[in-house]
Amino acid sequence: KALDNLHVGDYIGVKGELFTTQKGEISVLVKEFTFLSKTLRPLPEKWHGLTDQETAYRKRYLDLISNTETMDRFKFRSQFIRELRNFYAKHGFVELDTPVLQVAASGALAKPFKTHYNALDMDVYLRIAPEIYLKEAIVGGFDKIFEIARVFRNEGMDASHLQEFTMVEHYASYWDYKDNMKFTEEMFVEIVGKLKGSMNITIPNREGELVSVDLTPPWDRKTPRELNIADSGL
């Protein structure tokens, strides 16, 4: 009778014996159970999951419960950030946190979000980039610095642009663009190799279509002039 009150999404505590099904799934032969938490609203149907993309974006908790791919994506991001920090630390970089509220929008050509600082009675802006403060730190004496920064841009959005996103910036004294190209290549090759076990990855393009990308080094080096000539046909 008590089973009639159980629904998908309920949390229960159980006592019983562990066993493995014919398909190899570890299960529990329940002898006793108690309610821990009752779901107040029904979850998406078990087999089809959450199919409405708008609902998935606005109610991420439903997306996480319904789609293991979403959970895996969050876990992969966490692993990537951890390996990214390890890579920077291994190469002698110091991580900094620069101000999110700034008196002037700087570091990129983008429209900022504006808010008001009540204590000082002044308008401030959510940062559009951490660049200026990081460069000031280099002037102050740091040799190698980086930041994994949340930034905000009050502009349009598409599959590759959001108003709030994470930006990674680093600066190293006496490096030129060739040093940065080499460093960036080594970064992606090492981190992707650790996390994916392959240099071939699949990612969405600007249109949302999945495309295959080969990160096997060495990467092609092209100057802006070479790319302009190739794209314009001149």
Each predicted region: which residue ranges?
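Class II aminoacyl-tRNA synthetase catalytic cores and aaRS-like
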Residues: 1-234
